[in-house]
């Protein structure tokens, strides 16, 4: 009879159970087997009486279509995430709904519950509640009358789930934004906050809003973690993805090059602020545990001049305000203490226009906020909280300092480099100008030595650049500007006199220490102002590089600097050869020819003589009068430094340097290296100088 009893294929499950069951579960097993036998009897295709030609009408049923078990195109049932206990014991396909259709058909709806699987070895220490499946959209909460009653109570957990999961019908609502602000969130931010909004997370704690709060804090939501979820996690609540206030920090204002880096930095700052591990406090304190959950609205609590006593009482100040000075009532964060250090970690959780207290307290921070950096998304922020821009920035000391002088990299955006660079840099013109300058300044013998050094690397330059098209050259210039962007930040915090130049020798960047050492102002070095230097280092004794041959004894009439040879009067960056004396220039280009296409990580350490910046007016003054003038300046600044160091209004950059120079030269020890681009071509030269005392 084995050929006559065929079980319908869709009712057979593919996998076998791996569970071990106790004796008290055998009753359900017997009930399941009896139902299976009844189902098999009803699904017989051909009864015994049909073989003899007698058709039995009582057993004649509608024949179900047969499907070949080996046919890959046969219809299959969708497997459930986890089978119920009865279907698991009977090895039949179950569904996601509870109770499942098979248990309803067999009358086992009350006993239909998820089966227990055998744990893997690495999950032996995990609690059973953490291994439960994520409930699908077809999950039926109203199993029976008693289970529906248990699910309707928010404080009583469902059977078998413990205190780990929050019920979908009791998901909290976060009153972060007012009624008039709904739907005004930018689309990019909505996409980032879309996850976890339609379905509760399995690790989401239940947030309850405190009912008692001061009268001045009615517009601020105060979410607190419930005791059940707090005890389930062992002391601290996890991050709730369904809470939009948890991720309410401006990613664009953090000035990261990518979204994931800004999100990671914001989460680390959120954890460092202690908001995720602060235990629940009494609701009478009136302050939220998470500063990121504050709902800033256009009420009187955050105006420019709020009454302090109406906002915060003395016993309701949060923990983050301990390190700040208590203001006198003018504003929330006082600026009487200039030594409270860097902004706290909670400052990153606010929007881009809400500056940290230490930044707002400084007089030079009004024109250097986060609004100065170009962003692709405009986030709406309360206009009353944005500080007003100063109109007299040039009168104070903040007008002399650039945006990078106070905030450094925070208000700079490297993405502007890729938007502004559209043309390749003309290195051919730079080399032609360098050749013209060398021929007009140096003697023929020195010019020949420099020309030999440049001629030795000329074929390598030609072979590396002959296959590059216009797009490659533009990309090369973008790489140069992006690398220079990083070096400018390094030079801002480096106290060593440093200069960065292109492979043609044109100055691209210099820090203020180099300006103090040589007297060359940054505007002159970069070609923004005319070069009036008359110091070429030729006033001293003859150098060792000069030749005594008679053919080169005829002097050459040449201009003092390159600006005199430019007929159009157009300024250009200063060459490195204009900053060094004759012997130093020759030595530099000999080392450059050896290092340009040699060791990619090599460096040169030697001694050079830098030329001080001197104009015709400086050389016409007598040394005696200049020396007496400097004595007066030293006496004025010395009194300020000794008594009131913080009240110095002006510092003479020449003090102390005059004793180091001799004949307009400063003997320095230099260490420099070459940075190459992606095409393995020398891109820029980084040089450090230290004066030899």
From Swiss-Prot:
Annotated DNA-binding residue span(s): 84-112
GO process terms (BP): cellular response to starvation; gluconeogenesis
Listed Low complexity bias regions: 356-367, 394-408
Localization (cell): Nucleus
Record's keyword terms, sorted: Activator, DNA-binding, Gluconeogenesis, Metal-binding, Nucleus, Transcription, Transcription regulation, Zinc
Protein name: Transcription activator of gluconeogenesis BC1G_14637
InterPro entries: ERT1_acuK_gluconeogen_tf (IPR050335), PAS_13 (IPR056751), Zn2-C6_fun-type_DNA-bd_sf (IPR036864), Zn2Cys6_DnaBD (IPR001138)
Protein task: Transcription factor which regulates nonfermentable carbon utilization. Activator of gluconeogenetic genes.
Basic and acidic residues composition bias: residue spans: 21-49, 65-74
Protein family membership: Belongs to the ERT1/acuK family.
Annotated spans, Disordered: 1-75, 144-170, 273-299, 350-413, 531-567
Xref: Gene3D superfamilies: Zn(2)-C6 fungal-type DNA-binding domain
Biased composition (Acidic residues): 1-12
SMART domains: GAL4
Composition bias, Polar residues: 52-62, 144-155, 275-287, 369-379
GO function term, MF aspect, one: DNA-binding transcription factor activity, RNA polymerase II-specific
Transmembrane segments: none
Gene Ontology cellular component list: nucleus
